[in-house]
Amino acid sequence: MSSFLTRNLINRGLILQCRGIALSSLKGNNKSEEASTSHNTANVSPSKKTALYNFHVNNSGRIFCGWTLPVQYSASVIQSHLYTRSDASIFDVSHMLQIHVKGADRVRFFEKLIVSDLENLPENSACLTLYTNDHGGILDDLIVTKTSEGYLFVVSNAGRATEDLAHLHTQLAKAKRQGLDVDIEVLSNQALLALQGPRSAEVLQPHLPSSLDLSKFYFMQSRLTNFDNNSSIPCRINRSGYTGEDGFEISISNANAERVLNALLSSGIAQMAGLGPRDSLRLESGLCLYGNDIDEQTTPVEADLTWTIGKRRRQLADFPGAKIILEQLEKGASRKRVGIKSSGSCPRSGVEIRNSRDDKSRIIGKVTSGCPSPSLKLQNIGMAYIETPFSKVGNKVTINIRNRTMEAEIVKMPFVPTRYYKAPTNKKK
């Protein structure tokens, strides 16, 4: 990996992840990197490949272990990151879990698992929501689309696929015993492409029917359509993503994935990008990574994700962990997710945070994610959980990395303004 950012991450053992998938603890020298990114397919389990694996190999995607997805392409992580911010990049996120929830009672069933209000969500709209447990902890974060075709389209983290499916099937069995009309279909033959960046609509629009005008298709809206007006290439398009930029997530069959990808690349605008820039883009945008920034011991209140909890759901208090979560909403939580900026070495996950005043030896929090920000000229940024009394923006704290104490500051997130293509609001005079 050629960029300063990637070397920085490797040297500090930061776990690079793509929404829910840990690539590895990236330590070592260039020789070990080359060994890790070898294009030898003989030892790669088919179950760990996406439909676009051969495309990545043939187009210089630097494959890493685990899920065989590229960390980067020929461009450095920084170059891909900045290109996404200025133009458009395509990410293969086909490893993520895609499911359909079907049946007349699908909304009633799924609301028993999450915190959001699906009943009042308009058709062909999506929302970010959370699976929670009875203790108020976050089991996973996910995107749910309420389609006009009579099903819910759900996309959740690959790293939680086993746990999510077990949870879903347990709850499904209970629902069926109660007489609910509901079922789940795992879309194992579907790929998922994320086209992200300010020129994404320019890339995608020529491949859509004239009835789908992207200038009137807004953030978190969804549509089932045909790619290139070809009825043999149906696809679901959501205007959403994990970079903070305008963009689209396109669900297509594995059989059509490479064809669609090549068509998008033929614009000469979009470039391929890997998991390295995806991680730094989401961090700059203040977006959580499951397993780092949220987990089963973290509540939506602590994670500053209370906006995902629907007003009706709060009133009914009928979601898992509602008693604990609503009590924290009323009285506050003991800790809070915050943004930090620091000088010196970049803080990585697990680095302890201490009070810079009074008792400087007392640990008041821990870093959960960190990287040098490409958009901010490699300014060190990170997310952390800090005791609530110390979480005020502007508060100074200290971090210790390799026996060196450095100052950090609590800052607002996102670190870089998000640029979602939102519907215009009607302002009353």
Annotate each PLM feature.
Residues 2-18, 22-65, 69-72, 148-150, ...:
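Conserved, structured C-terminal
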Residues 57-90, 132-138:
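N-terminal flexible segment immediately upstream of the FAD-binding catalytic core
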Residues 73-74, 109-113, 350-351:
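Short, glycine/acidic-enriched capping/hinge loops at junctions between secondary-structure elements
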Residues 85-175:
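Extended, compositionally biased flexible segments
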